[in-house]
Amino acid sequence: MSKNIESLLLNQRYWDIFAVARNSSIDEACRIMDKNRIGALLVYCSDTNDPQDLEGIVTERDVIELISRKGKEALNNEVKEIMSKNIISVTPQCTKLEALDLMMENQIRHLAVMDKEKLVGVLSMRDLIKQL
């Protein structure tokens, strides 16, 4: 079994990349995550409307923290208000262990997978653990 992320991408059942525009409502982001049973969405620039023009990431954890602080009314706010702007990424050539170490070091559960400047996937901690 290969140890790099590329092999994981090739063996995935599907590799749709789920993203939302930064001016979308948090409620809309929650619906996309729920419908697709995912824990994070990449956030792209609303001006270009290009999912490759990444600006951040929003996770279930971001939503929970928002609701605990401001209540469910805050779900009408825009995604850009809670997204993390620092997108941490790996390349397809990165090993699974390096990716897991990066997640643990940064206390995150999702990594963007970038091949040069192109987004090719999103890797979750669950994806990695399934491979152990």
Please place each PLM-identified region on the residue numbering:
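Tandem CBS (Cystathionine beta-synthase) repeat/Bateman regulatory domains
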Residues: 1-132
